[in-house]
Amino acid sequence: MTAAHKLTYGQRAARFTNPAAKALLETMERKKSNLSVSVDVVKSADLLAIVDTVGPYICLIKTHVDVVEDFDSSLVTKLQALAEKHDFLIFEDRKFADIGNTVALQYSSGVHKIASWSHITNAHPVPGPSIISGLASVGQPLGRGLLLLAEMSTKGSLATGAYTEAAVQMARENRGFVIGFIAQRRMDGIGAPPGVNVEDEDFLVLTPGVGLDVKGDGMGQQYRTPKQVVQEDGCDVIIVGRGIYGKDPSKVEEIRRQAERYQAAGWAAYIERVNALV
C-alpha cells in the first residue's frame, strides 16, 4: 500500500474514519491550504480580528483560549461563525496532561467547555493511555479528534527517543480518536512492535516552529521553513503564529499578506512532495 505522505490530502481523507481528521483533510484539499495560524493574544477582539483576516488562507485555526482575559461564551459563538464563513476547523491547543477523570472534566466542563466547539485538541502522553480514554469518553461521541505531542519544536525538548516511540504506540492503539501528532517529522511506523503491519498507517502530523524569515525567537523556539517541514520531512500542516500577525493585530493588510505568503509556501512544498513521489 502507498505510504501516506505519497498520497494527496484528498486521497488520505478517504482512509480516515475519524470525522475531524476527514474534515480537516477535505478542507485542506478544497482550499489548497495546509496552513494553521496560531493566535495567541489576550483580547477577544484581537483574536477575532486576526482570525477573520487569515480565515480565507487557512485550513485550521489554533487557539489558546485560556490566555484570553475577557473570555466568555460569545467568543466561542463568534469563532464558530468565522469558521463557517471562511471554511476552516478549530484546534484548541489545550495540551491536556492529567489523569483520565480529570481531563474528561477539563475537556467537557469548566469555563471553556472545549469539547463543545473545538474539532481537534491535544494532549501530552505522559500520564499513559488513561489520558486518551478519558478524553475519548467526551470527544469521540462528538466526532472530535486528538493529537498527541510526540515531539516539540523547542530547544532541549525531552520529547525524543523512547518517549516519542511510546506516544506513537499509544496512538496506534487508539486510532478511532487519536488522529495524529504534534511532531517535527512523519511518525508512521515509529516504535512499532515486531510483526505489526504498519504499511497502511496514516497519522496527521501538525508542525509548529515554521518560519520564512527567522531561525528562533530568543525563548527557545526554533524555526524551519515550509519546504523543510512539508517537502523534506513529510509533515502535513504548518503552524505559524507571530510570523503572520506579528506584534500589532491592527495591521490587517500585512497580516493578510503574510497569511497568503505562508499558504502559498506550504502548498508549494506539498505539491513538490507529491509530484516527486508519483
Swiss-Prot record:
Keyword Protein transport: no
This protein's record includes keyword Lyase: yes
Catalytic activity, EC: 4.1.1.23
Enzyme class: lyase
SMART domains (alphabetical): OMPdecase
GO biological process, one term: 'de novo' UMP biosynthetic process
Transmembrane region(s): none
Family recorded in the similarity comment: Belongs to the OMP decarboxylase family.
NCBIfam families hit by this protein: pyrF (TIGR01740)
Protein name (record): Orotidine 5'-phosphate decarboxylase
Organism: Schizophyllum commune (Split gill fungus)
